[in-house]
């Protein structure tokens, strides 16, 4: 009989097989289970359920960790629970709690967050994005100026434009920050049309912007391509318009608002 490893309850051969199956952590779970007095009286099925649940939760935690890393959120610490509600801010607690369930993604609804600089648009978007990550959705955050730079680099260094399109078409939730802060180039507008077309009716996008929607048409070129981009965004969208409360000022430690989380 194969000897039992002095450090483990399972035989060395079983541990080797688990490792080959990419289930090496099961050996540790068995050790912990056998050492737990509360699990001594569990039958086989009970112990199997404990180990399976532990393995499943560990894999989910690792998945969420990797998804959050790949999301490249500007504010990865953001959360729905950390949102600040003040009458002057015009932000609905009920709406944010509802959006935090990520049900809007099932209907491929886009969210447009409008507000002046410092209103906390990025934090809200990242809070929703992090909620989506917590439900194991693939998420990506990008500033539009950075996306434009990536596109220019693609052309300059002859990189794959197809790969760049897939990078922003595939995520279940895409966050585009600093949307329409300046006029778009023809190449960027063309790229945005391809991305929006690829995401239309399949996934959701969050736009953070200081610009009113009425100004987008001119900033996107004032042509039929601009109309096509806007149509794919706004036809199935929800707009959150924030007030003039400056969240950066509230986060300043010199201000009297000491309990502001956002």
Give the positions of each predicted feature:
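Loop/turn-to-beta-strand initiation segments
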Residues: 136-138, 170-173, 200-207
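Post-Walker A helix-loop "phosphate-sensing" segment adjacent to the P-loop in P-loop NTPases
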Residues: 130-142
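Walker A/P-loop nucleotide-binding motif
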Residues: 108-124
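Interdomain "pre-motor" coupling segment immediately N-terminal to P-loop NTPase/helicase cores
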Residues: 19, 23-75
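Charged, compositionally biased N-terminal leader segments and the immediate start
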Residues: 1-21, 25-27
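N-terminal pre-Walker A segment at the start of P-loop NTPase domains
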Residues: 78-102
